């Protein structure tokens, strides 16, 4: 299942990622109030980004037993977080938590790799 998650992320395929999101996935942004508490809310944000012309070329920069550190390589970059990185927490082949970090060093530090 982790391979499915990795493949969906690396393809930057919204439908593929949707298939591996837990129904109760939580996405925590870097700013106060940036919080999604369901698959539907996460997908709504993804779809709105696509409608605005945002694209991604994700790179998995670190892989732990149940976590992936991802550089989404957004184009155009996120306005408030141009070096945005994310940690995806996995459980039984599904993404159960997504957490944003302002840059690679802070994301790697959060998983104990710095």
What do the PLM-derived regions correspond to, one by one?
Residues 1-114:
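C-terminal and inter-domain tail/linker signature
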């Amino acid at each position: 299942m982790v391979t499915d998650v990795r493949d969906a992320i690396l393809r930057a395929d919204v439908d593929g990622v949707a298939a591996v999101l837990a129904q109760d996935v939580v996405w925590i942004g870097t700013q106060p109030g940036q919080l999604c508490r369901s698959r539907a809310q996460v997908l709504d944000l993804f779809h709105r980004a696509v409608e605005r012309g945002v694209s991604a070329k994700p790179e998995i920069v670190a892989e732990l037993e149940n976590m992936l550190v991802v550089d989404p390589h957004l184009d155009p970059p996120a306005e408030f977080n141009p070096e945005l990185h994310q940690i995806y927490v996995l459980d039984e082949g599904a993404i159960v938590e997504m957490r944003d970090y302002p840059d690679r060093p802070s994301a790697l530090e959060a998983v104990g790799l710095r």
